[in-house]
Swiss-Prot record:
It comes from Parvibaculum lavamentivorans (strain DS-1 / DSM 13023 / NCIMB 13966). This is Bifunctional purine biosynthesis protein PurH. The keyword Transmembrane helix does not apply. Belongs to the PurH family. Keywords: Hydrolase, Multifunctional enzyme, Purine biosynthesis, Transferase. It holds the Pfam family AICARFT_IMPCHas. The IMP cyclohydrolase activity resides in the N-terminal region.
Amino acid sequence: MTSSKSHPEAADIQRVRRALLSVSDKTGLIDFARALHGAGVELISTGGTAKAIKDAALPVKDVADLTGFPEMMDGRVKTLHPKVHGGLLAVRDDAEHAAAMKEHGIAGIDLLCVNLYPFEATVAKGAAYDECVENIDIGGPAMIRAAAKNHAYVGVIVDGADYAAVIEEITGKGGTSLVLRKRLAQKAYARTAAYDAAISNWFANAIGETAPDYRAFGGSLKQTLRYGENPHQVASFYVTGENRPGVSNAEQLQGKELSYNNINDTDAAFELVGEFDPKLAPAIAIIKHANPCGVATGATLADAYRKALACDPVSAFGGIIAANRPLDGETAEEIARIFTEVIIAPEADEDARRIIGAKKNLRLLITHGLPDPATAGLFYKSVAGGLLVQSRDNGRVDTLDLKVVTKRAPTAQEMEDLKFAFRVCKHVKSNAIIYVKNGATVGIGAGQMSRVDSARIAARKAQDAAEAAGEKTPATIGSVVASDAFFPFADGLLSAAEAGATAVIQPGGSVRDDEVIAAADEKGLAMVMTGMRHFRH
């Protein structure tokens, strides 16, 4: 039940006489505790935090001595006590609150420092169900919310990055300011919200609930970006803690800060190369505006890069490059010849680091792993007043999934290229048409409102690339073609045949499939249907 009672206005600067510290991450704890002690602050603590402070030869009162009640049930119950929550929630200038504190022997707690049990990290490492449950913090969030509610009098720290600001105010102003306490309270509520979001989403996954009645979202700020897609837009980069190798948890070895567009494109590039098993062949993807302008496998990583670049060397300028194997010196030399924004790879050898190091603005990201294209996950898209949530497109097809629908079946080489093309198709904005030859894209048509236009654009770009390379015929001659969705009419397929394609892969499912199949037979094309669509918007 809420109270409608009004309280006296608190002073801006609140003196800190007593602080309760209870942290899982003890980074910076001792220096912080020492500074508080030096400022005359009484320290109260729990369990391992109290032991760490005592081991540093600093005076500290155990919370059990404050409450008169021992920790119990393996530490599940230690701070859930009126002497703790009363000390955090009491309105200091309210006569009734002050009388209650005196009657029950409750001392005010002016500063709370808590970071929570590492639930997110426990889940990320793949811990068993029971271990995850034991890392759900109860007392910590309760104290944090209490202190944040009473921010008029109490400061609350949930992030060691704020230790310095608090000490600076205590030593410089004699206490914490209301401005600082409000900022800390906002951060505290955001932290508990993100923590609860992680727990609720973990539970949903554990029980196979794909559409819970309530879905919580949380994340922590990784980077404040200079701007968004355009300079007039404000932007930030938040990470959710999902244990999936990629731009969110990559190590940046060099280069300028990533921009909004860099992050978006780098994610698209690395997710694409994750489609190709590094044990089978090295692969390279070159991305511009979240669309590939070249994808290839090769005998070596450098060979794959050269083949990917040949698809559309003009668009590759200023692009993002992703590799599915460690970056080596030969590949780095090739990449360094043109302007590139970002390289992302599982690792980079010494030669590659040295070569890329000469390009001071070129960003090099190392992930120590590849995203698994088969892993389940969620994809979010904002709409006015809501969010669309769908599972990650982890659909894949293999030879046994394909249905040959034409008189001629694909050759072995055509079949390999068809499967390659359909994997790439999944990562191209719809409507998508992809021409592939010998394990490399040779023409990409993306994002057109009609499928036939995408087919024509892809063929035209292949023609342009051939002319730029001084070749008489485009690489689409003798290629295969993939479509992310069915051909609604035969025109798109006929355009591909005119460009020189010899085999087609597409989902099928059009009311005019028979017409499209007949057109393929007339042109001598082999065609397989996947039964799986790969729209991407």
